Amino acid sequence: MTTNSKSLNLLQSLTCGICQNLFKDPNTLIPCGHAFCLDCLTTNASIKNCIQCKVEYTTYIPNHPLKQMIDCLDQSSNNNNSNNNSNGENTNNNNNIINNERSSFNGSNSNSIIGFIEGLSDSTSNGRRFSQQDGLRYSSGLLDGSNSGGSNNIRYCMEHYEHYYAFCNDCQAPVCPSCLLTTHNRHGMIPLTKDSIATKMKEYRDIVQSFKTKMSQYKDNITLYQKEIELLDSTFLQCKQSIQLMISNLHKVLKSRETYLLKEISSIHYASHMELTDRSSTLENEISEMEKLIGNGTDKFKDATEILNNQNLKFEFLEQFHHSRTQSKKNQNQDGLKPLFKTDLLFYKANNERVTEMINGTLGNISLLTFPLDDIGEVNIWDEPKENICIEKVRTNSNGIEEFEVKYGSLNKLIERLCLPNCYDDNYVNIFLLTYHSFCSSKKLLKKLIERFTIPEDLEAHGLTLASIHEIHMKIRSVLVKWINEYSPKFDQDTIHLFQNFNCRMQSEYTSIQEIENLLLNSNENSPSITSSQSLSSQSLYSQTNNNNNNNNNNSNNLQPTIQTNQTLSSNINNITISNLNNSNLTNNGTCKIQNSPPKNYQQSNYSSIFNGPSSSSSSSPSSPILSLNSLALINGNDNLVFESPLNSPRNNNNNNNNNSPRSSSFGASSALKFNSNNNSLNINSNMGGPYFPSPSSPTTNNIPNINHFSSRILSSSKNLEFNDIDEFEIAKQLTLIEFENFGRIKPIDLLTCVDLKHKTPHITNIMERFHNISTWVSTTIVRGENLKNRVKIVNKFIKIAEHLKNLNNFNSLTAILVAIQRSTVTKKDLVKQSVKIITDLEKLMSSDDSYSTYRTRLAQCSPPCVPYISIYLQDIMDLEKKNPSNIIVQTSSNKTQEFINFTRRSLISKVILDLASYQRFGYSTILPISNIQEYLNVHIDEL
């Protein structure tokens, strides 16, 4: 078998790989060395790669030794053929051919390769010679010789007319030697012996038997499927009949329904036609009546000439009226009450028929001087039922005063509570003005306040007295002043016009409101956003009013009474006028004292609110809106100015009695605060005797470090600064100043309108993008380290910066840096022990476990200034809005329900907003801003 394989390999090496025949003019390819026939290479000249090794060849040369070998083989083959023909061996059977093949394959080493090929050539030629004789036998499938011999049970190849030599296991077919050298080259072969043939026959029988078994199964399945098809056909017929029946029934039903609906439509059409006919007749009657009224009105307009001729009478009335007003002002200390404009008109109307006739003809009926609402069918605020508001008692404070809380109510009742006589809840006013955007527009709120300002004719039906009317008017004025000064909403032009009209009316009855005039002035200057100017205190309003009174009456300066008030405005409210109210100030014992001159330590910024941030003392510079918690304490007359309300954050619940706490400081205490324009923070007035809050401590030093050791680099351009050149504490301080400036711009309306994180305002978007940019800046700076050692050094520096931020109470930037460090490639194993301890403590501090309980505890204990983590407040507001619906449906009767505004939801949300706003009151006044470092931080952070 070994000799056979070698001989076949040798024969294959003498065969061309293209034509699969012995070489004819063999040529060798350069450089691979494979040989092919010259004709084959010429025919396939377009192929530049070798057929066998696929290597590109450059040229080919004749292979003379191989050509000589082929010639020798051909010559030997011709000699053998001639010898076979001469000896008459045409009658040899197939056994001689097989024996020759086996002798050639299994011959000894003495046989030469040429002799083997010659013998194979002889057997091949003999095979071709016998093919003509055995063609019929081969085609009929008969065997040559006896069936007992292994070599006798062989057939012939139909292609080459040679005896089968072996069985190709890959192709599953018998092959002859020529097939073995050509198409079945290098395939797995099985010799054709009796045992192998028997084994294959057994395998084929098993396969045939399995096929027969499967065929029987398929026949059985076909029978079953035919039965199923017959069953499905019968079922299909039944379903078809049932569907046809249902369709016919449905058609009948629809036909009857169509007939019924057509009858109904015709009846409705007839009824509507009759109704429209009746309405048209009614409208025609009304039109005729209106034409009559128009004719009567034309007659009345003709009488206007008579009114114009009575100018002397009008001037006489106005002179009398002015004289009465002047006399009333002189006698206000004796009467105890300032006469009202409407009261004077009613007096003259009742006592002078001619004047009454003139007023009715020119000004119209006084009772009709009400504000026309745009909402048709809306209930007037004076006609709203009393039960449309729910108020519950919350607690009794230390002074024995009962405190109430509004749960829900209608819009009219909620606005009415803003200016109830003998009752003023400063907490309620703050909550309402803080959250009214969620259920009411600014224009509608102003309309309702004007509607409340307009007193109805029937005073007794509403339980009103002159004192209560005056108190309602004063509280409406105070609410408007507080609304414009402290909350500074953006008003549209319609609302601005309403303010202007109301201020003109207010000027005719009392005095104009300076805040509204400033608002109108800003709107006339075409400012981009209609906001209030720098807030004026009630003392500035006093100065305006007092100057006007001095011009009209020189004797009014000597008539300034002093009034002592209690916890609420009761009997002494009759003695308070708009002029002395604006001059009021709180004494040390908690009483309200009216004085002629403004307080000595008065500052215009005292009445700013904490949402406005620090403001300049110049009235020309606009300020962002802030919220003051006790700005109406002067009007309320409360002897305790410390803000104690349910709106206080939980951290103040245990320290309500501690008046020295910076978070519970009174409104008056903030008068020592002054705006520092350099760093947008609050400086402490020297009159306070020292700083109001201690400076934030640092892990390196408790004082502000001297930066002279790197001042030469800092004072240079920020482009020359490098991260490693700047001190960690200085980076933390300048970053805190920038963050506090962005934090101070947040307004209450921003927190009310962006909690869904889809429609964020620019201020919220800015601070959230800043948080992301800081985190990205830290990650980028760490990655820029050339190797692990440099990256570890950068991480250690950022850890120190984070610790300084913690001591500066800048928790927002601290969280951004922690997020970047946690996702960096530098692990705690690479850091020094001190840095590992610091980063572990910081991670525990800002951990989100138990809803940031550790952070909330630290925040409650820290002293301002502070930059809290903003995302927590946004999440708290979102949770409150999900748990508390905007409106509440209450069953007012057995079969009637009514929807009210859920004011509890607004109170809870205002807690969060006021808690956040409390940190905007106090800035980092002790930190020196360095422009180059801030520019470096802004450039490297914002560019990301």
Curated annotation (Swiss-Prot):
Segments for region (Disordered): 80-102, 530-562, 587-623, 644-670
RING-type zinc finger span: 16-54
Keywords, sorted A to Z: Coiled coil, Guanine-nucleotide releasing factor, Metal-binding, Zinc, Zinc-finger
Sequence ranges of Low complexity compositional bias: 605-623, 648-670
GO molecular-function term, one example from the UniProt record: guanyl-nucleotide exchange factor activity
Coiled coil keyword on record: yes
Domain N-terminal Ras-GEF: 402-528
SUPFAM superfamilies for this protein: B-box zinc-binding domain (SSF57845), Ras GEF (SSF48366), RING/U-box (SSF57850)
Positions of the Ras-GEF domain: 727-944
Coiled coil region boundaries: 200-234, 271-303
Zinc finger motifs (B box-type), residue ranges: 152-192
Amino acid composition bias (Polar residues), ranges on this chain: 590-604
Binding locations of Zn(2+): C157, H160, C179, H184
Pfam families to which the protein is assigned, alphabetical: RasGEF, RasGEF_N, zf-B_box, zf-RING_UBOX
GO cellular component, one term: plasma membrane
BP terms from Gene Ontology: Ras protein signal transduction
Record's function text: Promotes the exchange of Ras-bound GDP by GTP.
PANTHER family noted in UniProt: GUANINE NUCLEOTIDE EXCHANGE FACTOR (PTHR23113), RAS GUANINE NUCLEOTIDE EXCHANGE FACTOR O (PTHR23113:SF347)
Protein name: Ras guanine nucleotide exchange factor O
Source organism of this protein record: Dictyostelium discoideum (Social amoeba)
Source organism phylogeny: Eukaryota, Amoebozoa, Evosea, Eumycetozoa, Dictyostelia
